[in-house]
């Protein structure tokens, strides 16, 4: 995980990274921002940087899981270049919206 630091202030405003859950073949992008940092493009910037990080390390695919009701996070992932996938039924009865990214050589 990486700290997300606002350039202007030097303050940590969130975190982001790629995590690899046991039993899954591809890493998953995760990020979170303080509410005060929402709406300024920081999540999109972080997601793009994390996907660049994945590409630079030769990772062929990254996934993301999002609450189907969380439109802002879905827009962030789409802007970062991820493609919306299927709705996945979870063991606890909830659903998760899947997003996928596949590396394209530069």
Task: Explain the meaning of each model-derived region.
Residues 1-106:
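Acyl-donor (CoA/ACP) binding surface of acyl/acetyltransferases
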């Amino acid at each position: 995980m990486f700290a997300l630091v606002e350039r202007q202030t030097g303050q940590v405003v969130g975190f982001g990274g790629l995590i690899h859950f046991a039993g899954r073949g591809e890493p998953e992008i995760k990020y979170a921002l303080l509410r005060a940092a929402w709406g300024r493009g920081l999540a999109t910037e972080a997601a793009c940087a994390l996907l660049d990080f994945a590409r630079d390390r030769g990772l062929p695919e990254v996934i993301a899981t999002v609450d189907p009701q969380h439109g802002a996070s879905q827009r962030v992932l789409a802007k970062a270049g991820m493609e919306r996938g299927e709705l996945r039924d979870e063991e606890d009865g909830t659903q998760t919206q899947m997003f996928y990214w596949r590396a394209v050589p530069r």
